[in-house]
Structure formats: C-alpha cells, structure tokens
Amino acid sequence: CGNKKPTRKLRRKIEQVDTLLEEYRKQDKTILKEIGAFDKGVLGQVKYLSNIVKFPIYKNTRTQYFESGEKNFPVMLQELKKAKHFIFMEYFIIHDGRMWGDILEILKQKAKQGVEVRLLYDDFGSLTTLPYQYYKELEECGIHCEAFNPVVPILSIVMNNRDHRKILVIDGHTGFTGGINLSDEYINEKERFGYWKDTGIMLKGEAVWNLTLMFLEIWNALRPTDQNFEEFLPHHYHPEPFEGDGYVQPYGDSPLDEETVGENVYLNIINAAQEYLYAFTPYLIIDNEMITALCLAAKRGVDVRIVTPQIPDKKTVFCLTQSYYRQLSEAGVKIYQFTPGFIHAKCMVCDDKVATVGTINLDYRSLYLHFECGVFLYQTKSVLAVKEDAKKTIEKSTFITPELMKQGFFKNLWQAILRLFAPLM
C-alpha cells in the first residue's frame, strides 16, 4: 500500500553505499542464542530486523527514556558539549528559536574546534521554518549540511518520500532518537496545541552503530564522503567496555524496498501481546491488517490502550483518526485522548518485555512513504520506563466512551469521504 518507490537515482546511490556498509552489519550469533533461550517469539522479531533488514541487535548498551522534550533537551545539550570527534544530525524539522539556537551555538563552537559536524534536514519538513537554501549559511560556519529531497515547483509523487527521522550521533558511542524535532514547541518553550507531549531515548554503547549506519547511508548517497567507516564505530573513540542492560536494536525503514519495516515491527508486537499493549500516536490512520491485529488482541483478552491527541495539529487528519475509534472500541480496544493537548510521541510497550520508541506514526505516510527509524527494546529498564509513562499519560487522558463517539450524519459522511483519501494523509 502506498508509494514505496522514490527516484531511481536516489535508490541507486543508496544501494551503492549499502554495498560499502554491508560488512559492518554482522550479527553476533551468541546474542540470538541468548534471546532464543528466553523467548522464541521475541527472537522472531529480532531475526526479522537482523536478517532481512540488516540491523543487528546488541547488548552492552545503556538506554535512557525521556517522557518529554523538555527532559530530553538538556541531556542532548550536555552530550553535544562532550563531542570531541564527530557529530551527525538528521532531522525532519528545524525551526529557529531557543532550542535550535542553543544547539547551533554548540555546533559552531565544535566545528571551530575541529569536530566533524554533519547535518541533514528534510527540505519539505523545514520548508516554512528555515530560510531558502539554509544549508549554504551553515556551510559558511564550518557545518557540513545537506537538504534532503529538495522541494521543486512541479507536482511529483517523489515529493512524498520525506526523511522523517530524528537522529543524533556523537563520537559513535552516544545516540538519540524519538519524536522530537528541533523546534521550540517540542520542549514546550512555545505553545501551539496545548501541552506538547513527546518522547525520546538516548543510547550509550554498541547499539548506537545502527543509528550511525542510517545516517551514513543517506549522507553518502547525497554527498559521497566516506570510504572507510572504521572511525565511526562505537569502540573507536571509546575503547573501554560499555555497560548495559537487556537488548537494544535500532532499526530503519525506507521507501527503497518492499519491506514495510515500521508496520511489521508494530504488527509483530501486537500479535505477540498476551497481557497488555499501550501505544502513543499523534495520528491513527491504519489499514485493515493493523485494525484486525489490534481488534484480535483485544478480543483475546489483551488490555489494548491507544492514546491520541485531544488538541490536534491537523483538524482534517484528526477527524479521520476519530473515524477509526468505533470499530476498535467495539472490539475492546480502549481509546484515550491526551487531555492537556497534543501527543506527538510514537511508542508501543507490551507485557513488561518489549517496547519501541521512534519516529513512526500509525499512519500511511510513516508506514509507507517516509524514511523512518525506531529502537526495539527487550528486557531493558527503559521498557518499564515507557510503561510507567504510558500509565501516567493515560491518567491525564480522557477515555473515549461510546457516548463520546456519537456524532451526526454529516460528520459520519465526512469521515467516510476522508477514508477514501486516507493513504494521502
């Protein structure tokens, strides 16, 4: 479903980079044996990401989950200030303000100190938030910069293929991802739709390599720079052993192949759920397979809860999101709306065992059209941190009862019409 075919030129260039990176994607088989001894179901998910999508799972990685942008941001600044060798950043939206201003000041300083600073931003995501050809301005400051898939004044389906990832890698051993873009509303420095609820995760250790691979893949497709990737490995600038608990597997999704990785990860988690499944998503625009999986989970006794916004950022998309409520609710799925405002987080947690935190919305664009990323977590402390955040968020949210779902004929008609255009929204 959806367009999974960006330009042939971009596809060819990324495939060339992938050939160079192939030897750096090897899976430690002893880790697979360990996981198989614990849980064969989780092993299937892990092997899918490792064998088919080529993102290995790692131990020796410490994770820290952030339940808000304002908790994530100071730690991000602190880690940026520690950079000694390189900083890689890949973001969908950059908007001038306090958040980007504080980060940019550090990036300029680090570039002057000889740190390799590279920045990728999506040209469409930042179309209305950055000056035209902003990358030239950053290059003058010593920051290597590329705008992904530049917007052109012609109608093209390729414009749908956006880089929706949020990745920060510092010296190969520290990484960040999640839903947080580089704009003030994400840290509640500026109010747009009530309180802005978002989440992020920091990795320290070997699993950061998968985030680095994602960045290097697109960067070198746009600007061929690297032939030797050894210096970007986690242990290159951190020869000491890493601490860690549990298993960590960052993964990417792209419209370059026929694998709907983001959707498959979600489906695997939903289908394996036995006790509970909690999910955050700003948009709930899903296909029949996802609807069936969620409904079946609820029907077999799983406590399925989904949190969407109370105050939307896009009213038409929100109306479409609400059109899915009744079918899910009738099957036993509990729908909540985040009362304080807008929830932009993209998380799923299940049975105190597994969770995923990343950039992937439950909508057609994220699942089929965009470059995305997430982190699959198994038996880490962060899994329970996501669960606790979900419980606290649900307490602040409004449970959508059948009474609240009642609406008039014309709204039902409008939602039915919107459903026809769901893949475009």
Q: Where does each model-flagged region fall?
A:
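A general structural signal for well-ordered alpha-helical packing
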Residues: 263, 270, 291, 304, ...
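N-terminal localization/anchoring segments of enzymes in phospholipid and broader phosphate metabolism
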Residues: 1-264, 268, 272, 296, ...
